[in-house]
Amino acid sequence: MIFVGETMERANHSLVRLRREGEELTLDEKAEICSELELQQKYVDIASNIIGDLSSLPMVGKIVGTIAAAAMTVTHVASGRLDIEQTLLGCSDLPFDQIKEVLEKRFNEVDRKLESHSAALEEITKLVEKSISAVEKTRKQMNKRFDEVMKSIQDAKVSPIVSKINNFARYFDTEKERIRGLKLNDYILKLEEPNGILLHFKESRTPKDDSLQAPLFSIIQEGYAVPKSIDDESAFKVLYALLYGTQTYISVMFFLLEQYSFLANHYYEKGDLEKYDEYFNSLNNVFLDFKSSLVGTGTSNNEGLIDKVLQVLMTFKNSEFLGLGKNGVDEMLNEKINLFNKIKEEIESKQRMTMSETPENFAQISFDKDITTPIGDWRDGREVRYAVQYASETLFSKIGHWSDPVSVREKACPTLRMPVDQTRRNVLVFRKFDNSKPQLVGEITPYLSNFIDIDRDLYNAASNPDSAVGFKEFTKLNYDGANIRATFDQGRTIFHAVAKSGNDKILFGLTFLVKSTELNQPDKKGYTPIHVAADSGNAGIVNLLIQRGVSINSKTYHFLQTPLHLAAQRGFVNTFQRLMESSEININERDKDGFTPLHYAVRGGERILEAFMNQIGIDVNAKSNKGLTPFHLAIIKNDWQVASTLLRNKKVDINAVDENNMTALHYAAILGYLETTKQLINLKEINANVVSSPGLLSALHYAILYKHDDVASFLLRSSNVNVNLKALGGITPLHLAVMQGRKQVLSLMFNIGVNIEQQTDEKYTPLHLAAMSKYPELIQILLDQDSNFEAKTNSGATPLHLATFKGKSQAALILLNNEVNWRDTDENGQMPIHGAATTGLLDVAQAIISIDATVLDIEDKNSDTPLNLAAQNSHIDAVKYFIDQGADINTRNKNGHAPLLAFSKKGNLDMVKYLFDKNANVYIADNNGMNFFYYAVRNGHLNIIKYAMSEKDKFEWSNIDNNRRDECPKEECAISHFAVCDAVQFDKIEIVKFFIGTLGNFNICGPLHQAARYGHLHIVKYLVEEEVLSVDGSKTDTPLCYASENGHLAVVQYLVSNGAKVNHDCANGMTAIDKAITKNHLQVVQFLAANGVDFRRKNSRGATPFLTAVAENAFDIAEYLIREKRQDININEQNVDKETALHLAVYYKNLQMIKLLVKYGIDVTIRNAYDKTVLDIATDAKFSNIVKYLKKNSGKFRREYKSSYGEHSFLQTNEISRFIDGKSIEHDHPQFINADNESSQLFSGTASKIDVIGTLLLIDVLIRYFSKQGYISKESDSASDGITQAAALSITEKFEDVLNSLPNKSAKEQVDLADVHGKVYAALKSGRNSQIHQILCSSLKSISTLKPEDMEKLVSVIMNSHSSLSMPEATDSANEAYGETLHLFGESCRHSEDYISQKFSTNPFSFESEKKIQKISI
């Protein structure tokens, strides 16, 4: 992990490096440092930002482009205020030469990539560029953190392996960057070095010790990258290294493909087909080798690296401890899995980079055409050879061997005969005369066997600069059948060739043979013949093409240039005039970056500009996308003649601004063009004081910033230049001159009377800036001008303050020699002596104390003395000097920090010894009670600990320490207690081993408990396995309690696997699972649940784990227990206050929990000790949303509960296996369900509309009574709550079935099923079984359509249908009473409950006499 403290330490180190006087840093070094200081606006990615802008100047060219790019840096420097701190530290002092070097490298790279690719390499190039961008994007992001991962890996086994990955990746990046900027010849030499980088990178896939493959597979095979728990920090870091290394491995493959593709293409363009074949072959071999190692061969026993990495990622993703994506890791895993799957798919989809087969040359050559020599390249005595190459849509073979030479004798353009390719591939044919450059002469399509070598000669004739010869040869070849539509290099046709050569005779003849659309055919880069003619200055060809109606404004593919753009940049006036004769021409047409042809004409020169300026409709102030006008470009090009030509048009705006509000004058000043600057200043309309945006920098500011003293001096002397103009932040040219050390400019400023006390917005004067700068000699120059050395900034700092706090020793001494005030304090109450102590300027401190020793122990507002500041910043010489001078060695600031604490924290044993010898107070502590010993423990400095314990006459760790009394409130604790606790808490295992293993302090602090609390598994293992401590410990809270409470799953797993008791009491009457639940650690709960937890055990609050989960609002845990542990919990259980989980959920207004509980069937009618249902509580508390939900959903819970639990699986337990779920009448007598059934016609006229099902339900209750198909068995005196709940639920569900079957669909809504269930449950639970039929009957009566007088008729029918009903154990008296009871049952739905009670009281089988009837129940 990367900690804030480490980041700050790096930043401080960077400041020190920047502040060192006289040390020059490279661009990359300075960029890195400024980035660490978070000052990256000026340097981080500055080169790439500039390159991004370069695309806006495609017409300027390489050399001028470099200059223009330098100008574009202004937009990045001026993108915000010029920060004084950054500027003086060097983060704004642009190293212009270094930037140009970076640009030159990038230009060289771009030039190489712009070279044309052979058709065979185009697809490969696309694949490489597409894939490498995806890999490199994330790899570069990972690269930034990999150093931190490296530093933090301490595992002795893993560290060397990861180090190999790091070393290889660094070497790869360095070499790749080093060669990218080489010029073409140097680049090729570097790539072709024997045993060079290409060979080394190819071997990265071998198992050699210094390869990349070896450490990656070692990590995978040893399982180092699979975390064992969410706390397995080491495995996380190794996983990071594995992913970074694998992406580097993939990048190496694509880098090699890119380089071999480049080399193959280079030699193809040169015509060296042997070299082309060599690298083309290497290209394929590299791909196949790496493909095999990355994705395997497709067999199960030969998986590739990507497959193995994906397995690691999936193992991690599917691990139990990761949970449901709630640890912030899931997103990263998915991202990496998707990336590697995408790369794998991309690689697997490409079987090969080239065809495996090298074509044989079966060509038989015969000269059948009557074409005599000499013509074209055909000359008697020359030797001609042919070679072929197979081509499919995306794959190409190598070029085969050259045929035997054939001598040319009198005839040209032979016929080549070869067999038809059986696989139907195209065949490319190459030709070479003697040792000249080979040429592609044509392509044989499938099914053809004859090829006449004549089309290339026609193309060459059209390309011949000798028009007469070319026309003659073209005429002959055309007559003999050459194809005028054949295409060759880069998709160019004969029309392109003619346009380039300017042979108007050929073109004139062609115009009669082809359509005008063919004259518009673009090549692969979008150049049409008129583009080529314009770019070549062939005005006659342009004129012919215009007459044939070609598109005059067509654009190239990349830069979107029109023919007019190309003619303009070449300066072809006649061509320009021919183009302008077209009525369709758009003179202000813009290219990709917004440049018009007039912009391009700046490069074309004075004559073409004059031609433009005379045109009607020309926009002389047209702006590019970046806001540059042609006048801007003329000044950037430093071509005053061109600028003067533009100025002849009075409409030219010389003060036009670009997107950064910069005028041409700004650019002249930036680039140091003195003569151009003079010309501009002398223009009457010039505004010399325009400022850029948002930096508000004028031309004078920029001239000084870029150190062009001659330009700056000229501008200072100019009357129309404001020399005191303030940029953003109040920075004037004078301030900049000091910051940049421009002595000549400063001298001139003094001479012209510039105010030397100018202040920035923060009240920095030039003297303040000189004191902080790397130009200390300027201080004396300013003092000689009577500069105020006591001036203060907004923070109260004098120049001497700034010199000392910025570490500028020479500047501080100069100021002291001029008797400045060394006792002035700033807003922090600090004097210059504090600054000298902070930055370690010993000579300055000595100079101040030699003048005034009273400052030795003076405190600032934080109570820091010079000694304390020197100690905190590890300036050892200064510390010793201050102590020797009598400084208080035990000085403490407001936070209690003291010198001894500072050096102990940083692990400086020598200084700790020194302070011991100087009798420092070894028990001194800061405001947090931390003494030197604790700091040594927490930071892992075992050497200091051992030294301190050896100095028993000075330090005794058994002493009571009251500074940390609040951490040990019940007893007096010694230093040893806190030290051992700290060692365990801060994961310092070597110190733990020393304290416990070496010194034998097993009982101090309860180390095993502490290790479990903080999740330090390796310390837990050490204590259990090596020191044999009991896994259950000796305290009330066991180690398992601590680990569970803090969610350390790996520790919990280890302790349980080693015998820890999962149901052991913790503090407060809780167990480990209670502790885990209170902190919502689902994974720990799941593990404990699977390892013997007693879910019925109640804690001191009378709550089981389930009630605890609800009380703690641990929704995921509650849901898990209900869903996965329903066999072990009772959803309706109550605590000591008779509150169910639903009561608790309502108390906490947890609607999500309420919905969960209702969904799974909790009883909403249960009352607590205060006789309140959940609805009562919600209503009283005015929880309107909960009340609304409970009222709406309380009747639906049983159906959902049943669907969730199946057919009441809980009824299958041994406890309730005696329950008999009897069949209902509904199932035994389907004739009563369907009103259309024949049997149901018995009721026609009388009961056609009655609710038969409702009555059947009531009869079912009665029949169960007499047949003993009871809802609850009475074998035991009292049914368990679970059985009673099941019976009540079953009865209520059957009643719900009745309601669902009624024709009146609103019937269900009219009955409160929750109320029905509650009453039934209460009746069964209390033994008042007689009330059940009354409850059901009463509920049904309000919605029944049954006429009372028809009830007995219906009962009699039901009676008959039950004739076969068996009542095996019913007594005779019970059977005898059956008929009368049916009648009474009907009466019970007609009369009051009093009537029913009266009737039943006289019945021999009344429920008052229920006890007489054994084993009969409702």
Swiss-Prot record:
Processed by furin-like proteases at both the N- and C-termini. One of its GO terms (cellular component) is extracellular region. It is found in: Secreted; Target cell membrane. Residues 238-257 are annotated as: Helix H8 is the probable transmembrane region of the tetrameric pore inserted in the target cell membrane. Disulfide bonds join 413-1066. Residues 1-20 form the signal peptide. Keywords: ANK repeat, Cleavage on pair of basic residues, Disulfide bond, Exocytosis, Membrane, Neurotoxin, Presynaptic neurotoxin, Repeat, Secreted, Signal, Target cell membrane, Target membrane, Toxin, Transmembrane. One of its GO terms (biological process) is exocytosis. ANK repeats lie at residues 458-489, 490-521, 525-554, 559-589, 593-622, 626-656, 660-690, 695-723, 729-758, 762-791, 795-824, 828-857, 862-891, 895-924, 928-957, 971-1003, 1004-1033, 1035-1064, 1068-1097, 1101-1131, 1137-1166, 1170-1199. PROSITE patterns: ANK_REP_REGION, ANK_REPEAT. GO terms for molecular function: toxin activity. Homotetramer in membranes. The H8 helix is predicted to insert into membranes and form pores by assembling into tetramers. The helix is contained within a helical bundle domain that undergoes significant conformational changes during pore formation to allow exposure of the H8 transmembrane helix and transition of the toxin from a soluble monomer to a transmembrane tetramer. Is the main neurotoxin responsible for the human envenomation syndrome known as latrodectism that results from bites by Latrodectus species. Belongs to the cationic peptide 01 (latrotoxin) family. 03 (alpha-latrotoxin) subfamily. This is Alpha-latrotoxin-Lhe1a.
